Amino acid sequence: MSANTFIHDNFLLENKYAEELYHNYSKNQPIIDYHNHLNPQFIAEDKIFDNITNVWINGDHYKWRAMRTLGIDEQFVTGNGSDKDKFLNWAKTVPYTMRNPLYHWTHLELARYFDIYDLLNEKSAEKIYTETTEKINSQAYSTQNLLKKVNAELVCTTEDPIDSLEFHKKFANNSTGIKMSTAFRPDKAILIANDGYNAYLDTLGDVSGVAINTFADLQAALRNRIEFFNANGCKLSDHGLDQIYFEDFTESEISSIFKKKRENRIITPEEALKFQSAVLIFLSETYHEFGWVQQFHLGALRNNNARMHRILGPDTGWDSIGDYPQAQKLSSFLNALDSKDKLTKTIIYNLNPADNEVMATMIGNFNDGSVRGKVQFGSGWWFLDQKDGMTKQLNALSNMGLISCFVGMLTDSRSFLSFPRHEYFRRILCNLLGDEIKRGELPNDMEWIGKLVADISYNNAKEYFKF
């Protein structure tokens, strides 16, 4: 181990209680990564990457934003620079990311996957590139073996309703001991004002075998795909929305709006909101029928830089936190479902930290005793997926609800090297509790608090999702 490393056995663990909680109750728990954006083909085909850049930097908009901020030319971020030059420019950036979670993640990932404890910087970059690429090129670092290294029991990718789930099927009977599931992400069927909506419906119709001419046809097509996903092991849905849509509507209004859209006539913003509300209610009622968990990621302000969006497209690092009002529409939406006894298990993630207490109290309105932790306040997401953000989420949930019922961490990542984020979360959780034991705010009952830690690390998710 390098003398200048700060990644050691007790990283982030500030006292003996935190150390005991982590090492005895959390560290060795398997990982259930119930939401990510991994490529299922790479898992099913046990892909071996050419070099560290392809598995670590390509597709990682967290790193891209940092590099651009430092003044790195786009050629070496997403452009036509060589893989090695992109890595060297990332290495140049890393020392300047101190106090950003990228600094911790980077060194945790180098340590856990490659047993490298040197700090990544311009001086160490050549050596680390050579060493990591040599390992990455071997079977021991195939995608399936990368998942085994971190004790991943299950990964749940995210797919559009039109997806064939070809690679989930291919992997279904594997002998690795790893399960791969999928989450149903139908946002393209909801957002009627988006460019290409009609073309998307044509594709959805082809895949589902339903000619989509009316709103009833759209419902039938979506139900067909839910049935297909369910038959292939899907147990979750996911929605990435600025806010929950909930407007009063009638069936005749929705039929008329849908007809207008299919005739390529202009839809007003008010009509779009009514339509989106109708589709969302229909989907959520159907999720309840199939016993799925629905997830809502709320509050992102996306594609802010029109110039770069035109060049690079979405999910390339031009998004930020929005300040949309969340409480009233979310309450009305959940209440409408609950009133008909059609509210399924639900996880709500907020991107704006100002909404932490809003979400932490909202979930209590609809936890009716039918299921343990039925409605969940999700872990710190995206810009909040860091030490301060996760601590604030844990504190809000503890103060307003029951942290003991929390289903814990997820990566929400596109990278096969991001799984140490589970370790990061577990260390933060154990340190938070250990600190309160030390101060006398919690009893020195390691068996009971250790059970709580093990539950949040693994057991609660295992029971909640029933993969």
Curated annotation (Swiss-Prot):
Keyword ATP-binding recorded: no
Similarity section: Belongs to the metallo-dependent hydrolases superfamily. Uronate isomerase family.
Enzyme Commission no: 5.3.1.12
GO molecular function terms listed in the Swiss-Prot or TrEMBL record: glucuronate isomerase activity
Keyword terms of this UniProt record: Isomerase
Protein's name according to its UniProt entry: Uronate isomerase
Reaction equations catalysed: D-glucuronate = D-fructuronate; aldehydo-D-galacturonate = keto-D-tagaturonate
Presence of keyword Kinase: no
Pathway the protein acts in: Carbohydrate metabolism; pentose and glucuronate interconversion
GO biological process: D-galacturonate catabolic process; D-glucuronate catabolic process
Pfam families for this protein: UxaC
